[in-house]
């Protein structure tokens, strides 16, 4: 959204006058980012692997799985957007994915069902593009953005 502007009086004509502007995201902007993050995580949950590619969550087993795992989202992280230089960033936020997978013991062949939530953290960067659209890069909070 746009504001009506603020009048700044300078004491010297045609000279740069330093001002400090603190941008804040609109609720609409935060909602768009939240929807995009949720969509990204939903796409992660469709991958039937223990460590979904490019995703902030995964599950490790030392035994064998008997069928591809099934992921779902138990709790989406709540997005908080803050200014970051000329762009924006997503403050680290916690979420929970849910995994359901059968695991066969290499020791005795027994099978147990893993049906549990997996906690994870996301963060990210948001870049405003020249055409007015945004580019959102979601990362895992523990690993950093790079």
Which sequence ranges carry the predicted segments?
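Structured interaction patches on ligand/partner-binding surfaces of diverse proteins
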Residues: 2-23
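Alpha-helix initiation/capping motif
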Residues: 25-26, 77
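Solvent-exposed, acidic/flexible segments
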Residues: 26-37
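Membrane-lipid interaction segments
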Residues: 38-39, 43-146
């Amino acid at each position: 959204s746009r504001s009506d502007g603020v009048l700044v009086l300078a004491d010297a004509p045609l000279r740069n006058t330093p001002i400090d502007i603190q941008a804040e995201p609109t609720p609409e902007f935060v909602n768009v980012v939240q929807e995009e993050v949720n969509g990204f995580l939903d796409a992660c949950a469709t991958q039937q692997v223990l460590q979904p590619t490019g995703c902030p969550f995964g599950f490790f087993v030392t035994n064998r799985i008997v069928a591809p795992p099934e992921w779902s989202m138990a709790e989406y992280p709540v997005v908080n957007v803050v200014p970051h230089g000329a762009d924006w960033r997503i403050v680290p936020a916690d979420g929970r994915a849910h995994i359901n997978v059968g695991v066969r013991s290499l020791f005795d062949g027994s099978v147990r069902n893993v049906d549990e939530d997996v906690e994870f953290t996301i963060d990210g960067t948001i870049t405003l593009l020249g055409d007015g659209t945004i580019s959102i890069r979601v990362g895992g909070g523990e690993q950093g953005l790079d």
